[in-house]
Amino acid sequence: MTNVVQETIGGLNSPRTCPPCILVIFGATGDLTARKLLPALYHLTKEGRLSDQFVCVGFARREKSNELFRQEMKQAVIQFSPSELDIKVWEDFQQRLFYHRSEFDNNMGYTSLKDSLEDLDKTYGTRGNRLFYLSTPPQYFSRIIENLNKHKLFYKNQDQGKPWSRVIIEKPFGRDLDSAKQLQQCINENLNENSVYHIDHYLGKETVQNILTTRFANTIFESCWNSQYIDHVQISLSETIGIGSRGNFFEKSGMLRDMVQNHMMQLLCLLTMEPPTTFDADEIRKEKIKILQRISPFSEGSSIVRGQYGPGTVQGVSVLGYREEENVDKDSRVETYVALKTVINNPRWLGVPFYLRAGKRLAKKSTDISIIFKKSPYNLFAAEECSRCPIENDLLIIRIQPDEGVALKFNCKVPGTNNIVRPVKMDFRYDSYFQTTTPEAYERLLCDCIIGDRTLFTGGDEVMASWKLFTPVLEEWDQDSSPSFPNYPAGSSGPKEADALIERDGRSWRPL
């Protein structure tokens, strides 16, 4: 255990300085680039993590000059960066920011891109290192991957000391198991699997990174992290927002594909996996896959339910139902809410139920993990004065957003002559304790990819294991031509079916 902890501290928390490289963002005019990627790159530059040998090239279909692209990205940084724009830093950074216009399947576009990258290599000393970020709709992934290989933009021979090339793939990685297998086959034929980084931005969040440290660096937690002491676990991911302008995207995905199959499964794996032999990306991945392979199959109604929001009021504002949103079918059967119950069939978690829920247009925005411990077996507090305040289950809450931190709720005697017991809470918050701004997830993930650290990235085998679980559910839903939608009002805590899912076990959801 000591080795794991030491490597955790040395691996996840060691200072990172990125080597020279060119980052090519496919889909550079999209929302992700403006909201997340460019602000992250700007902040890494401001912090001195990216040198003047780093270059960024935006690749997209719209006609645009370098100057216009830089102006648009400057406005994006001003709008979405958590810190105020430093003009001097930006002026330096934008000189290494370029735009390349092409269709994603145009041979000439890739030929001219290759020429441009070679020129930039010479000008900025990027040593031939290339990072390609696929921030496009998923239907373009295979075309781009094939063209990277066809035009020799990706190096298949990446021996130590030679220039490297890597590819970051955004979710969704396929729509189901078959499409994920097809995309994986395309990767196997054109790239090297160990140079492909499947990005899940939840893994870049500070509190998510802290899950393994909380577990394996603290005997007080790891010793009771099992079915002997834990009654059940709840993972909640609630959003107050709807789908906004993403109607076309969400109609093709839904909540299960968008959040559950990836983000929530990663949280579940980190929470439940066995300690890896070393804190190495491959060893961590092996343990996560073991968890995915031991999850029982889901069945509609008994272990997984879905919902869709109707009109309602969110934080005092009247909002439309999902079917009234822009670019959404008026009879849409797409789910905006998923709740499920699962068990993990291994000795550590035998008999412990895990309840997961994720939804849009709910009453509150929050993502947290609640570990509810079993009550003490000792019946020492049954006297009349104690019965007025029943003993509650101890509770560990890992808050991922907002107010990142960890809280422990336990029972304590109230001062006085009567033997009255009440729950109290110890609350750790990142911002107040460390007195520093928590880094954005994409800052960490981009930096790790440039360095070549795969620890916080998922692998293709993980993705397949997750799709194997959920593809039967999606197929069953596709056969249901008339689900009872909408089945929860916007601004609520979700559909009644989700409450029934957990209440039939004599439990209830924690308040959002």
From Swiss-Prot:
Q: Where is this region: Disordered?
A: 479-512
| Residue numbers binding substrate | H201, K205, E239, D258, K360, K365
EC number(s) from the headed UniProt entry: 1.1.1.49
List GO terms (cellular component aspect): cytosol
Q: In which pathway does it act?
A: Carbohydrate degradation; pentose phosphate pathway; D-ribulose 5-phosphate from D-glucose 6-phosphate (oxidative stage): step 1/3
**Basic and acidic residues compositional bias, start-end:** 496-512
Q: Which UniProt keywords apply?
A: Carbohydrate metabolism, Glucose metabolism, NADP, Oxidoreductase
Where NADP(+) binds, per the record, is at R61, E103, F104, K171
GO-annotated molecular function: glucose-6-phosphate dehydrogenase activity; NADP binding
Record field: catalytic activity: D-glucose 6-phosphate + NADP(+) = 6-phospho-D-glucono-1,5-lactone + NADPH + H(+)
Q: Where is the active site?
A: H263
What InterPro entries does UniProt report for this protein, alphabetically?
G6P_DH, G6P_DH_AS, G6P_DH_C, G6P_DH_NAD-bd, NAD(P)-bd_dom_sf
A Pfam family cross-referenced in the UniProt record is G6PD_N
Output one GO BP term.
Answer: glucose metabolic process
Transmembrane spans: none
Q: Does the keyword Protease apply?
A: no
Kindly give the PANTHER family that the UniProt entry links to this protein: GLUCOSE-6-PHOSPHATE 1-DEHYDROGENASE (PTHR23429:SF0), GLUCOSE-6-PHOSPHATE 1-DEHYDROGENASE G6PD (PTHR23429)
NCBIfam families annotated for this entry?
A: zwf
Q: What does this protein do?
A: Catalyzes the oxidation of glucose 6-phosphate to 6-phosphogluconolactone.
Q: What is this protein called?
A: Glucose-6-phosphate 1-dehydrogenase
- The organism of origin for this protein: Chlamydia pneumoniae (Chlamydophila pneumoniae)
